[in-house]
Amino acid sequence: MKTKKSYDKVTRWVTPPILMLIIIHIITGACSSNAYPIFAQKSYENPREATGRIVCANCHLAKKSVEVEVPQSVLPNSVFEAVVKIPYDTQIKQVLANGKKGGLNVGAVLILPEGFELAPPERISPEIKEKMGTLNFQNYSPSKKNIIVIGPIPGQKYQEILFPILSPDPANKKEIHFQKYPIYVGGNRGRGQIYPNGSKSNNTVYNASVTGRISQILRKEKGGYEVTIENISQGRSVIDIIPPGPELLVSEGEFVKADQPLTNNPNVGGFGQINAEIVLQDPSRIQGLLGFLASVVLAQIFLVLKKKQFEKVQLAEMEF
């Protein structure tokens, strides 16, 4: 009989930078337990696809919620807070790259309108700095300062991430206008299920590659399993490799069908995205509005005074 091992490999055409990132991810998985934003930065020029989908969802297959808080409107050349919330139960543990259990990390991507960018340190107030803590933000790329990423960072401490944002000034940038703009947000908790090269992580379910009977389950010395499936119709046996982490659901002698789960799905995290809107407000419009409101108030005051004066005249005429 022929023996075939069906497992995921990093193919030869993978570029050295991506290969290095994957190696780093495996080595440091115990402490950095969710996918790195740099994976998306290296693989995609823009993190938001034409369909509106943020590319982080290509590796983080489970859908989870995310929230964002931004002001309804901001003035030009001003610093404001954009708060991304990534809620999850901090009591749960996830499978790390070494197969052990550990806490979840979180990460986020904030896609701002053109012209909006991360506020420089000298423009950030002490109050905002105190709220931010020691967070380290970075631009998605040198040419995309309006896209900001962060992570992985400890989810236990940072379920709320405060981004200090500087609004643009149309007086200095002619392509910027006073209007309503969209903001796109992605937030993740936990590790991904797929690496950028398409191979599986150990944070996902593993299925049978063929239909047949399980003839042997070999527990590997460093964790994980080799599951041998006898495929009678094809006259061969196939060995499915299961890395440390997922829990085995099958036993020797059991008959399985192709694509039937051999393990549980250990993933407890997921990715979510949400949209928001913000208005870049013209200061002159605010001044005009204040002037209008002041005129309305004055008109009301004069109307009340006039009414009282008229009542006094009527009262005097009645007494006369």
From Swiss-Prot:
Q: Which GO molecular-function terms appear in the entry?
A: electron transfer activity; heme binding; iron ion binding
Q: Where in the cell is it found?
A: Plastid, Chloroplast thylakoid membrane
List cofactor names only: heme
Q: Where does heme bind?
A: Y36, C56, C59, H60
Q: How does it sit in the membrane?
A: Single-pass membrane protein
Which residue spans traverse the membrane? 286-306
The cofactor note reads: Binds 1 heme group covalently.
Chief location category: plastid
- GO BP annotations, alphabetical order: photosynthesis
Is Protease among the key words of this record?
A: no
User: Cellular component per GO?
Assistant: chloroplast thylakoid membrane
Sorted alphabetically, the keyword list is: Chloroplast, Electron transport, Heme, Iron, Membrane, Metal-binding, Photosynthesis, Plastid, Signal, Thylakoid, Transmembrane, Transmembrane helix, Transport
Leader peptide range in chain numbering: 1-32
Q: Which family does it belong to?
A: Belongs to the cytochrome f family.
Instruction: Name the PANTHER family for this protein.
Output: CYTOCHROME F, PTHR33288
| Quaternary structure, from the entry | The 4 large subunits of the cytochrome b6-f complex are cytochrome b6, subunit IV (17 kDa polypeptide, petD), cytochrome f and the Rieske protein, while the 4 small subunits are PetG, PetL, PetM and PetN. The complex functions as a dimer.
Q: Give the function comment from the record.
A: Component of the cytochrome b6-f complex, which mediates electron transfer between photosystem II (PSII) and photosystem I (PSI), cyclic electron flow around PSI, and state transitions.
The protein's name: Cytochrome f
